[in-house]
Amino acid sequence: MANGIYSSYLPLRRIVRKIEQILREEMDKIDGQEVQFPVVMPASLWDESGRYDSIGDELLRFTDRNNAKMVLGMTHEEAAVHLVREYAQSYTKYPFMIYQIQTKFRDEARPRAGLIRVREFTMKDAYSFHTSQEDLEQYYEKCHAAYERIFERVGVPEVVSVKSDSGMMGGNISHEFMLLTPVGEDSIVLCDSCDYRANMEAAENISDIARDAESAALEKVYTPNVHTIEDVCNFFGDETKNSCKAVVYQQNVDDKYVVLFIRGDLEVNETKLVNFLGERSEERR
């Protein structure tokens, strides 16, 4: 119908209904309660969470006929919290989990690969509420196991669960299930000697390079027609891993500059930078 927007019909609808039934069965096994949130939400809920301003153009914003600011739901954390405020005012109602299967809209900058990256899509999202961190962590493991069963039941057993970046959703712990394919666009790290698995955006490592040599005296050197760190290292006849480069970013909020010093053979992980700064920045070279 449009870029990133598709209609579905038989036999796709039959397949989708079967997958949705599997999702419901597995969510019900871990005591999930199915709900239905509104697609359109008042902007005030998103103002309260701070995401009305922090999320970019992916969030579709509009004004209704009464000049009230509204958003078209791309996720429903705010709506879930609003529901819990009204429903679960007593600690005796905790813990509990609510989930829904709903059409959502995210204004992707580059919709591509058919149904893989679209703007309008169906998503099963779930939200759980607990009285302690320990209870939350235990339930997180139940959810993780439920998703493993889901992938097994739908016939996609070759997925890999990896540590991931929580992105706009926030949180300290996040995993995503990655389907290994040569046409994929994400990279993951798998350790051969342990169970560590992570998306490159969230992966952590310890440098295996140690520099025992003493630093030479500081000296100003003329480097004509040398523009990159590779050019500089070639000019001095050394490897880029033995150098340090500065990368400058401009913060969008107040136009302040952030200078990052990183080993010459590495690149800045901009996802980690955004998480550290709490906002998006633009690179200035």
Model-identified regions with their sequence ranges:
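Short, basic and Ser/Thr-rich N-terminal targeting/leader segments
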Residues: 2, 33, 66, 95, ...
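Extended, low-hydrophobicity, polar/charged segments
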Residues: 77-82, 86, 112-126, 134-285
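Hydrophobic alpha-helical hairpins/lids featuring a short glycine-rich hinge
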Residues: 65-99, 103
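A residue-level signal for beta-strand positions that form part of recognition/binding surfaces
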Residues: 5, 59, 69, 95-98, ...
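TRNA-binding/sensing appendages of the translation machinery
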Residues: 1-65, 76, 122, 127-167, ...
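Conserved oxyanion/phosphate-binding beta-strand-loop segments in alpha/beta enzyme cores
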Residues: 1, 24-25, 31, 53, ...
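Acidic, His- and aromatic-enriched active-site or binding-groove loops in soluble protein domains
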Residues: 51-73, 179-195
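Short acidic (Asp/Glu) patches
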Residues: 51-58, 84-86, 106-109
